[in-house]
Swiss-Prot record:
Family: Belongs to the universal ribosomal protein uL18 family.
One GO location term (cellular component): cytosolic large ribosomal subunit
UniProt GO molecular function: 5S rRNA binding; structural constituent of ribosome
Keyword Ribonucleoprotein included in the entry's annotation: yes
Protein's organism: Treponema pallidum (strain Nichols)
InterPro entries documented for this protein: Ribosomal_uL18_bac-type (IPR004389), Ribosomal_uL18_bac/euk (IPR005484)
Keyword hit for rRNA-binding: yes
Gene3D superfamilies, alphabetized: 3.30.420.100
GO biological process terms on file: translation
Pfam families associated with the record: Ribosomal_L18p
Name the UniProt record assigns to this protein: Large ribosomal subunit protein uL18
Upper classification of the organism: Bacteria, Pseudomonadati, Spirochaetota, Spirochaetia, Spirochaetales
Assembly, per entry: Part of the 50S ribosomal subunit; part of the 5S rRNA/L5/L18/L25 subcomplex. Contacts the 5S and 23S rRNAs.
Function noted in UniProt: This is one of the proteins that bind and probably mediate the attachment of the 5S RNA into the large ribosomal subunit, where it forms part of the central protuberance.
């Protein structure tokens, strides 16, 4: 799988594998993972024990279709995932940056979720 990737993607995949060895979500403290592309942002909250997604937000959803993958959109996506988590009475998560550097859009999603009241 890594042979077909570019150098930049290969480095991200190596970071992702290294991070996922240590990061594991449970029902009490699920894993919040961020995916970003050049155009969109997607955030999922995953219970790894049950192998299920508890909540998700994406710029592909009808309410956020005008947003793109930039810092201001990342803040809005983070606040929305925070609201959805608090509705389900989940206030603590483990943040999984999914191999991306903790900078820009990824950091904005985390800040938005913290602003909504989620702890990690």
């Amino acid at each position: 799988m890594l042979r077909k990737c570019s150098d930049k993607q290969r480095k991200r995949m190596k970071r992702k594998v290294h991070i996922r060895k240590r990061v594991y979500g449970t029902a009490v403290r699920p894993r919040m993972t961020v995916f970003r592309s050049n155009r969109n942002i997607s955030v999922q909250v995953i219970d790894d024990d049950a192998r299920s997604t508890l909540a998700s937000v994406s710029t592909l959803e009808k309410d956020f279709v005008l947003l793109r993958a930039n810092v201001s959109s990342g803040l809005q996506i983070g606040e929305e995932i925070g609201r959805r988590l608090l509705e389900k009475h989940i206030d603590t998560v483990i943040f999984d940056r999914n191999g991306y550097l903790y900078h820009g859009v990824v950091a904005a999603v985390a800040d938005g979720a913290r602003k909504a009241g989620v702890k990690f």
